[in-house]
Design a protein with these regions (language model features):
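Short C-terminal boundary/hinge segments that cap the last helix of small helical domains
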Residues: 74-84
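Alpha-helical residues within the helix-turn-helix
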Residues: 31, 42, 71
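A short, Lys/Arg-rich alpha-helix, primarily the initiator
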Residues: 2-34
Length: 84
């Protein structure tokens, strides 16, 4: 959510903004983990290109995939989408 100036409420992100935030956050988490995309895919039980497809916007994670990523990186679902 984005805080609007002076209004005291948050504005919902567009789907494009949310997708971009997800990709940016996922990239950050992958880099911070010190693991390769392939290693993460193997540990999650996905094919070797799964993370790359998510990062490039060529695939959308399923609800199960979102839960797996959040658990793997030890973050909340909202944090995975760039919210604090």
């Amino acid at each position: 959510m984005v805080e609007t100036k002076g209004k005291g409420y948050a504005k919902a992100l567009t789907s494009e903004e949310r997708d971009k935030k997800f990709r940016e956050t996922l990239w950050y988490l992958v880099v911070q983990s010190g693991r390769s995309e392939r290693q993460i895919c193997q540990q999650l039980g996905h094919n070797s290109g799964y993370i790359n497809k998510l990062l490039n916007g060529n695939a959308d994670p399923s609800y199960k995939g979102i839960l797996e990523l959040a658990e793997y990186f030890n973050v909340g679902i909202r944090e995975l989408f760039g919210e604090k």
